[in-house]
């Protein structure tokens, strides 16, 4: 597996470098995803180690982190947006890229390849596809946590009104700073909102807070809290009726979740 890991890592570096361009608008998005890929790969490995997985499974987690956003590069180069609703689902696109362009998938054991595809396919969905396979669920949860933890880092510079204009086409800079009523309602209830309905900068911020309820491991949530991501997002929420109830519920949930010891059942 060590040799295969090295070949996959080298392939991914070469693949990402194909999208380097003199077009600074495109390059802004490509650069963000190149850096994000490195962070998520490292986080996935660290979380797998925290969960005391086997060396083989730690390496699988690494591979999943490495390839989880491979579809983003083709997506952004074509559509100049990371908005799946305005282009293509980037996880599904990533699986196409791996099938069409990555020559080492067949070197994985069939069960490992299925795990990889399942985790990547589900890393960006509202919920994980139902399955009785505990290993698939574990790796999907692990990858979702690793991805979310780093996306918090990515988005922090774009929270302020001044930062909005610098964001690489997440949402049009002229969009409202307020939160849409459906998102306020979901926040107050502690439920996930439909990402496809994102319309405003306020919606985008609130969705990141709602992610807290979808974090699977207390290790991840503790990292999110320790790095100040939750407090910073709350700081830059609009002064809007209905949000206080959601903030109170969120803080109570975080306190309880962070105190739970991570356990896995495979």
Per-region residue spans from a language model:
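Divalent metal-dependent phosphate-bond-processing catalytic cores, especially two-metal-ion Mg2+/Mn2+ enzymes
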Residues: 2-3, 29-38, 42, 46-54, ...
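Short low-complexity stretches enriched in small and charged residues
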Residues: 16-21, 52, 74-77, 102-109, ...
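Hydrophobic/aromatic-rich structural module bridging two neighboring secondary-structure elements via a short loop
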Residues: 73-115, 126
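Alpha-helical scaffolds flanking conserved acidic
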Residues: 53-66, 110-119, 136-142
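Acidic/His-rich, divalent-metal-binding segments that scaffold phosphate/diphosphate chemistry
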Residues: 1-92, 133
